[in-house]
């Protein structure tokens, strides 16, 4: 097994042609604070199951096959998301990534060393013929339409904006309404603005706020500061940028009307993704040959495959999840869905890695 300087882990099954670029498959093992047990994990375990099946069946391939576990995909502790795959793809600077800090001021680089997973292999030095990522949909479409497989053609781009509102701490009971500099009121109005912006770009755009930090967070104190993160996503570049631009234009006006301060900073960004046609067709062909119901789908979430797609042909296989629920401890899938997704992954990889008879 190889480990690079960002902690990405690679397990290789040799091919008959040692000079041929490998076919990769995998995902991530990190999770959300209250995340489920299939987000990311399915893709890594599915890759290992493919590897085990090839060994059990004594199937040889021309190209080596690699299972990869990408580090810090979620970006929960160390923002942004897909940090290590972003460095691998040359999108993010490695030293910048090492300097990302958590809520306690500890850096990603320091913690990578502490847990013993800062490898010696230079990040991004590996050649990739193609990569496939198996993942749960994290949405309700496949289950609602009774589809076994989602053939992912595109990935949504996103803008994460960190917004800091500065009001004035004051007693909630004795401060007259007209004399307040109320950051929490600003939060409420900006939450509504985020929703309005997303609803103006239906059916594909989404917008929301998932993180809110209120200070001092006391029941009878008007907050002096509120920090929250806006998440805008769309598969269309113009729409995505337009959503960000409208928020940046209108949010300061709302803050000014309330007499509170506002700062808006970019916390994360990537452009919409179009996955490789050949890899997408390999997935679709596998689903059709195996008799699984399927449909094209756009990934609403960001994935490591979105970054890797910049340096190698890439595509994704998706399977349904119960009620579309993800980033939740109740996240669940059926054995049949997991089996179908892994089966399609196996055959797409074999088509690409070329079976040696």
Where are these regions (language model features)?
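Flexible, glycine/charged-enriched surface loops at secondary-structure junctions
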Residues: 4, 60-64, 119-124, 174, ...
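Short beta-alpha connecting loops at secondary-structure transitions
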Residues: 95-96, 233-236, 267-269, 324-338
């Amino acid at each position: 097994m190889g480990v690079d300087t960002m902690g990405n882990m690679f397990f290789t099954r040799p091919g008959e042609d040692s000079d041929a670029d490998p076919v990769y498959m995998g995902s991530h093992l990190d999770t959300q604070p209250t995340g489920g047990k299939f987000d990311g994990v399915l893709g890594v375990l599915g890759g290992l199951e493919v590897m085990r099946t090839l060994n059990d069946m004594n199937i040889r391939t021309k190209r080596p096959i690699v299972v990869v576990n990408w580090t810090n995909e979620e970006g929960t502790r160390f923002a942004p998301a897909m940090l290590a795959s972003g460095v691998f793809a040359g999108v993010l600077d490695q030293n910048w990534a090492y300097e990302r800090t958590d809520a306690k001021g500890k850096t990603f680089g320091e913690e990578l060393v502490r847990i013993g997973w800062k490898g010696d292999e230079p990040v991004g030095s590996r050649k990739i013929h193609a990569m496939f990522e198996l993942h749960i949909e994290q949405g309700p479409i496949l289950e609602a339409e009774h589809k076994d497989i989602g053939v992912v053609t595109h990935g949504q781009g996103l803008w994460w904006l960190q917004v800091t509102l500065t009001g004035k701490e004051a007693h909630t009971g004795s401060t007259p309404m007209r004399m307040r500099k109320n950051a929490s009121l600003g939060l409420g109005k900006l939450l509504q603005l985020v929703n309005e912006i997303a609803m103006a770009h239906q059916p594909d755009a989404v917008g929301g706020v998932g993180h809110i930090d209120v200070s001092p967070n006391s029941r009878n104190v008007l907050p002096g500061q509120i920090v929250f993160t806006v998440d805008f996503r769309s598969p269309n570049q113009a729409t995505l940028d337009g959503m960000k631009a409208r928020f940046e234009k209108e949010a300061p006006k709302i803050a000014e009307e309330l007499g509170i301060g506002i700062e808006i900073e970019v916390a994360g960004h990537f452009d919409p993704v179009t996955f490789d046609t050949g890899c997408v067709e390999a997935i679709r062909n596998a689903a059709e040959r195996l008799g699984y119901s399927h449909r094209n789908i756009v990934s609403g979430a960001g994935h490591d495959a979105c970054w890797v797609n910049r340096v190698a042909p890439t595509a994704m296989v998706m399977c349904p999840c119960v009620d579309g629920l993800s980033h939740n401890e109740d996240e669940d899938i059926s054995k049949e869905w997991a089996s179908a997704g892994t089966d399609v992954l196996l055959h797409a990889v074999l088509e690409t890695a070329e079976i040696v008879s």
